[in-house]
Each structure stands twice: as C-alpha cells, then as structure tokens.
Design a protein with these regions (language model features):
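Acidic-glycine-rich active-site phosphate/pyrophosphate-binding loop
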Residues: 1-12, 45-59, 234-253, 285-303, ...
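A structural signal for small-residue-enriched, beta-sheet-centric alpha/beta enzyme cores
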Residues: 2-3, 22-26, 53-60, 64-67, ...
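Conserved phosphate/anionic-ligand binding catalytic regions in large, soluble enzymes, centered on
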Residues: 21-37, 256-273, 314-319
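Early transmembrane hairpin of solute transport permeases
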Residues: 29-128, 132
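Hydrophobic alpha-helical bundle architecture
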Residues: 38-41, 67, 278-291, 301-367, ...
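Flexible, glycine/charged-enriched surface loops at secondary-structure junctions
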Residues: 45-49, 90-95, 117-118, 194-200, ...
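Signature of multi-pass transmembrane helix bundles
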Residues: 110-253, 419-425
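Membrane-embedded translocation segments of transport machinery
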Residues: 233, 237, 250-284
C-alpha cells in the first residue's frame, strides 16, 4: 500500500483517533467529562444535578471504581469527580489530576448535593445527559455515540451547541468501513514505521506500566497474579496474565492511564499486551513489534465497527482475537494464518456477555487471549472451524460481519435483561 493511497492515510488517522490515553474506565470518565463541561458552562458549583444515561452507560459505570475519588463507585461519583476536579480540555484524562483537597470536596458534594439518575432510551446505545443547576440557572450537556462526542451544550434556554443525533453514527471520525483484513494486512506490511511510532509507542509505554502495576499491587480478584501462580510463567501464560493484570488495576481504581482501543481501555490492553509479551519472548525487534501491534489494533477496531462501541457482546472477545492475529504475525504467520486465527478465536468465545465494567473483566480478557492463541495453534496444526460451524461462515469478512450482527442486533434483548438485573440489584 503506497503512502499516497487514501486508505493508507485513513488507516494512520484511524489509529490516531482510536489509540488515545484515558485515565480510568472510559464510561465513567465520559460521564465525568460531561459533568465537568456542564459545570464549566454553568460557571459555578451547582446545588442540584440531574443525570440521564442509557442502559449501557449505567451498566458500565455501576460497578467500577472511579479513579482519584478514594475508591468511590457509580454514576454520582463520576459526576461529582468531574464537577469538582474535572479539567475539560483533558477530555478522557479529565480527572487525571486531582488534589487531596478535591477528593475531600467530592465526598462532601455527594453528601450535600442531590444527584438524580434516570435511565433514558432515546434510541442511542451511548447516551449521557448531565444537567447542573444553581438557583434558577442551569447548564445542560449531552454526549452521544462515543466518549468525547458532545452534541448539545445549553445554558438557560440558549443552545450554545446543538448537533442533531441521527442514529448511531460517529460524525467527525474517519470512515471505519474502509477497514478490511486484506487491506489491513497490506497496510501493516508496507507502513513506514515512522508514521506509527508515536501512537503505537505510547501504547507500549502506558499499557506496559499499568500491567506492571497490576502484578505488583492488590487489585480486584488479582487474575493476573493468579494465572502466573497457577500455571507458571511460559509466554502463553504471561500473555494472558499481563493483559488481565492491566484490567485488574484499571477496573479497581488504579490511577495510571492506558491507551484505549475502540473506546475501551480493557480492549486496548487486550490487543496490545499479549502481542508485546510474544515480541519480547522471541526478540522480534522494534519494527516487527510495531507492525504486529498495528495489525492487532486495526483488527480489533474492524470488528468493533460492526458490533458498536457498547453492546452485550464482550469486547474482550474481539480484542483477544485481534491479539491472536498479532501473535500469528510475530510467529512468522502469513495472511492465511492471521485470518484463520481470527475466525477460530471468534468461534471459540463469541457469545460471552458484557455485564458491565468490573473486576471479572480481567478473567474474561484471559479467556479471550487464550482463545486467540489457541486459534493460531489450531491452524498451525492443520485444524480449523469451517463455514457452517455455528456462526462461522465462508471468509473472514463474512464471519466478522456475523459477529457484528450478533453483537449489535442479536444481543439487544440480552443487553436489556442484563441492565434490568443490574438496575434492580
């Protein structure tokens, strides 16, 4: 693929748009971002807060610890953090810098200011509305479809920004429908590594740091440490353990940032950390490692384009399959090995549900990475799943399309039932 090719430029831009830093689980951070923006527009601390959130937002915020809040959980905590300490210009790092005094003020704010939460359904899976009030004055902010996409800013009946939300589109982002496995393969083999060094290099640095912390500290169910203590430290176990350890830390209050993928820190770690571990094991060199990471990241984004940002379909599954693709490439695999790895992995663990962001995400990540590695080893030994084996159909693109259909359409009712269970808990 030539540098002058429009797809080459688009793939570089997609990586830059998707591989961005975020501090804390991205759904509560998006809520904190909306709250910080609303407070900025209001111009003072509010004396009442009203929050509307779609079911998938409620699901992903309910059980996860919001960083820099002294281990608070839930929607009110995320909103309070944004209102008290949020720096709007930092977007998904909106509460990365919080003083001890601000943490104390958050707790006091939660005790003294009424914060209402309403489940809203406006036909958009990703939907957040924050209204902050002071006396007769108010400010309102809406985020829709992706984490930093502010579509409405209103103060005292005056609309300062009003972008129509027409279904689940991602206006302003590079067209993800340009992605396909054949072109991704062409791109990663021809890309000038200098064009991706900064964006991929930051992922290596950030995600390695949080995996290290997850293995050193005591976070959640410590899945990463359990894997190493139980199964030893061969490269396959380390690949699973380090991805899980990053999630252990991230889901349970660690204040280190990660580089996300498809709007998710867990997916960003899942499609990068196993690949890094294999690259180090086989001493592949920086250039091959960067190409493998470009492959795994773009493969993950490609799958999520059909599934959507939030779904009842666990995003670790698509990221684990993508990690398998990157590992296959590092181990000397060609295009056939890569695409069969993806299909095999999807056949193994597709259907694992997302029941929100919380400690058990780390174990789901480990299972998904295991499926990615198994999918590759199957094909190495002449084994594979064929068209007609469940949701597997002829060709990698057709199978990925089926996964998108399953995640976006087929699991809608599953998502609704999970949300009902969590709201009524």
């Amino acid at each position: 693929m030539e540098k002058t090719n429009e797809k080459y430029k688009a793939y570089i831009q997609i990586l830059k748009e998707e591989l961005v830093p975020a501090m804390g689980c991205t759904e509560p951070i998006a809520l904190a971002y909306a709250a910080a923006k609303a407070r900025e527009v209001l111009g003072c601390l509010p004396d009442a807060v009203e929050i509307g959130a779609s079911g998938s937002i409620i699901k992903n915020v309910k059980s996860v610890i919001v960083p820099n809040t002294n281990h608070l959980k839930g929607i009110p905590a995320a909103a309070a953090a944004g209102i008290i300490a949020g720096k709007v210009e930092k977007e998904l790092e909106v509460i990365a810098e919080v003083s001890e005094e601000e943490t104390v003020r958050m707790a006091e704010f939660l005790k003294t200011v009424p914060i209402s939460v309403e489940h809203i359904d406006q036909g958009v899976t990703f939907d957040i509305i924050v209204v902050v009030k002071k006396g007769d004055s108010y400010a309102k902010v809406r985020i829709a479809n992706y984490h930093t996409n502010i579509v409405l800013v209103e103060k005292d009946e005056e609309k300062l920004l009003d972008i129509p939300v027409e279904g689940e589109t991602e206006e302003g982002l590079t067209d993800r429908s340009l992605l396909n496995m054949e072109d991704i393969w062409d791109f990663i083999n021809s890309v000038d590594v200098a064009d991706i060094r900064e964006v991929i290099g930051r992922q290596v640095e950030y995600n390695t740091a949080i995996a290290d912390e997850g293995l050193k500290g005591d976070y959640g169910a410590n899945i990463g440490s359990v894997l190493l203590e139980t199964y030893g430290d061969d490269v396959r176990t380390r690949a699973k353990a380090r991805a899980a350890a990053g999630s252990d830390a991230r889901m349970n209050g660690c204040e280190l940032p990660v580089i996300i993928n498809a709007g998710s820190g867990n997916q960003g770690m899942t499609c990068s950390l196993p690949v890094l571990e294999y690259a180090r094991e086989f001493q592949c060199g920086e250039e091959k490692m960067y190409r493998a990471l470009a492959l795994s990241n773009l493969t993950a984004i490609h799958q999520k384009t059909g599934i959507g940002r939030l779904s009842a379909y666990c995003g670790a599954v698509s990221a684990g399959a993508a990690a398998g693709a990157g590992i296959a490439y590092l181990c000397g695999g060609g295009y056939e090995e890569v695409i069969h790895t993806v299909v095999n992995a999807l056949a193994i663990v597709s259907g694992m549900v997302c029941d929100g962001a919380k400690a058990s995400c780390a174990a789901k990540i480990a299972a998904s990475v295991d499926a990615g590695i198994l999918g590759y080893n199957m094909f190495l030994r002449g084994q594979q799943f064929y068209a007609g084996d469940g949701i597997v159909t002829k060709g990698v693109e057709a199978t990925i399309s089926n996964i998108g259909r399953l995640g976006k359409d087929g699991m809608k009712e599953t998502n609704e039932e999970i949300i009902k269970m969590m709201i009524n808990d």
